[in-house]
C-alpha cells in the first residue's frame, strides 16, 4: 500500500504540471504497451523477471488510475524472441501492425535493439528499454531511451577494480557481437594512460559450443602475460551471456587459468546457470570470479522499494531479479507519467516529455536522469561474486564502484 500511495503522489504531481492545450485530443482509455523479451530461451531468466516487473508496474499504474476515478488502463503484449534478431524484428513488426507504438523493457540485448532500431526510428515507435548497454547505440534524438548506463560506465567500473587488484594485463574472452565488442573496446579505452593493458583476447561467435578449445586458447594468452607480469597480475575478462557457466566449467582443472584472476560482465551477474553447474560454481568460487552490474543502492544496502519489488518478482518467477529487470518496472511507470503529461498515447508526444519525467523520477532508489543520448546519465556498479554456502553456492555482493569519484568500496 505504501508503494501505491507514494507513486500516487508522484502521479498527481505530474497531472498538476500537465499543460493546457487549446486543442483537446480524444482520450484513449486502453493503452497497450509491447515488450519483446526472451521468455523461453537460454536467457529467459532475464526475460521472465523483466516480464514480472512489467506486470507489477501495470498493476500499480492501473491502481492509481482507479484511485482517482480515471477509466485509463494500461496492458502489455509480449513477444518471445529467444534472443533471435529475426524473431525480435518480426515481433516488433507484429506489434506495430496491431497498433502498438510504445515498447517497454526489451529488447533483451544490444544486438536485438540494433536490429530493430531502423524500424523504430522510421515508424516513430518509442522504446523505453533497460537491457541494452552497447555504446554504439548511444544516439541522440532517436526513438530509443535506455534506463541503464552504457558500457563506458561498466568499463570504468571494471577498470577501477583492475587497478584496485593491481592487475597488469587483462585477457578478454568475449562474444563477437554488438555487446561483446562494445564492452571490450570500452575497456581498451579505459586502459589508456593507466597501469594495465587489455590484450586483443579471444572472441567467439554467438552459438559456438567449442568451450574447451576457446578456454585452452585463452590459457595460452594468460601464460604469455603471466611470464611478463606474474600470474597474480593477469586477469581473464569473461564477456558472455548464458555461456559463462560453460566457460567457467571448462576452465576447472586448468592450472594456468586457476592462478589468474577472473572478472565477468553484467550479463553474468546473478545467473542461476552459473550456480547450478557444479564445475562452474566451484571454479568461480575458487578464483573469486566477480562481475559488475549497474547497482540500485550499494553492495551493502538495497533501498527498501527495490528490495520489496525484488521479493515480489522472486515470488512470481523463482528468480532473483537484477537491476536491469527491476528497471523494467520503472520503464512502465515513466511511460505512464509521460502519457499523463502529454495527454496522448502518441509516441512522438510521449518521446518529447520522457527526459523531463526521468529527471524527476527516483522511486526505486536510483535517479533515472538521462544524458544527451537518451541513456541513463550515471550509476554506481555493484560487483557480485560466487561463494559456497551450505551444500551449494550463492551470488553475494562483494563491492561497489562509486561512479561519482571513480573508486571501489569493498562490502
Name each model feature, range by range.
Residues 9, 14-31:
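Bacterial Sec-dependent N-terminal signal peptides
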Residues 34-55, 79-85, 176, 180, ...:
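Extracytoplasmic "Venus flytrap"
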Residues 46-64, 87, 154, 178-197, ...:
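Short, solvent-exposed amphipathic alpha-helices that sit
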Residues 312-326, 336-395:
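Segments of small-molecule ligand-sensing domains
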Amino acid at each position: 500500500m505504501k508503494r501505491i500511495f507514494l507513486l500516487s503522489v508522484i502521479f498527481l504531481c505530474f497531472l498538476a504540471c500537465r499543460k493546457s492545450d487549446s486543442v483537446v485530443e480524444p482520450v484513449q482509455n486502453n493503452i497497450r504497451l509491447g515488450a519483446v523479451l526472451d521468455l523461453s530461451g537460454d536467457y529467459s531468466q532475464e526475460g521472465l523477471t523483466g516480464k514480472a516487473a512489467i506486470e507489477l508496474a501495470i498493476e500499480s499504474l492501473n491502481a492509481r488510475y482507479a484511485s482517482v476515478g480515471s477509466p485509463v488502463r494500461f496492458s502489455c503484449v509480449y513477444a518471445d524472441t529467444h534472443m533471435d534478431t529475426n524473431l525480435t524484428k518480426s515481433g516488433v513488426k507484429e506489434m506495430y501492425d496491431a497498433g502498438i507504438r510504445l515498447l517497454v523493457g526489451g529488447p533483451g540485448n544490444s544486438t536485438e535493439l540494433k536490429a530493430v532500431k531502423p524500424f523504430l526510428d522510421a515508424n516513430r515507435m518509442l522504446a523505453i528499454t533497460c537491457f541494452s548497454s552497447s555504446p554504439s547505440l548511444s544516439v541522440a534524438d532517436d526513438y530509443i531511451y535506455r534506463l541503464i548506463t552504457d558500457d563506458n560506465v561498466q568499463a570504468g567500473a571494471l577498470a577501477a577494480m583492475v587497478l584496485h587488484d593491481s592487475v597488469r594485463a587483462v585477457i578478454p574472452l568475449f562474444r563477437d557481437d554488438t555487446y561483446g565488442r562494445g564492452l571490450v573496446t570500452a575497456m581498451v579505452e579505459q586502459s589508456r594512460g593507466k597501469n594495465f593493458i587489455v590484450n586483443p583476447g579471444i572472441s567467439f561467435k554467438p552459438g559456438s559450443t567449442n568451450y574447451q578449445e576457446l578456454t585452452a586458447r585463452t590459457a595460452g594468452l594468460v601464460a604469455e602475460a603471466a611470464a611478463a607480469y606474474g600470474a597474480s597480475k593477469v586477469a581473464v575478462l569473461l564477456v558472455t551471456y548464458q555461456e559463462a557457466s560453460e566457460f567457467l566449467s571448462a576452465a576447472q582443472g586448468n592450472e594456468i587459468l586457476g592462478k589468474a584472476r577472473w572478472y565477468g560482465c553484467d550479463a553474468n551477474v546473478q545467473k542461476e546457470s552459473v550456480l547450478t553447474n557444479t564445475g562452474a560454481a566451484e571454479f568461480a568460487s575458487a578464483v573469486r570470479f566477480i562481475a559488475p552490474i549497474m547497482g540500485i543502492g550499494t553492495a551493502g544496502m538495497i533501498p527498501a522499494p527495490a528490495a520489496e519489488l525484488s521479493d515480489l518478482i522472486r515470488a512470481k518467477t523463482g528468480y532473483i531479479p537484477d537491476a536491469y529487470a527491476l528497471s523494467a518496472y520503472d520503464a512502465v511507470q515513466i511511460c505512464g507519467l509521460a502519457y499523463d503529461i502529454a495527454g496522448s498515447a502518441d509516441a512522438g508526444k510521449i518521446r518529447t516529455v520522457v527526459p523531463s519525467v526521468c529527471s524527476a523520477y527516483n522511486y526505486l532508489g536510483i535517479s533515472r536522469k538521462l544524458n544527451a543520448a537518451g541513456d541513463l546519465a550515471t550509476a554506481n556498479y555493484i560487483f557480485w561474486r560466487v561463494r559456497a554456502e551450505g551444500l551449494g553456492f550463492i551470488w553475494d555482493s562483494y563491492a561497489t564502484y562509486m561512479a561519482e569519484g571513480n573508486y571501489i568500496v569493498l562490502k
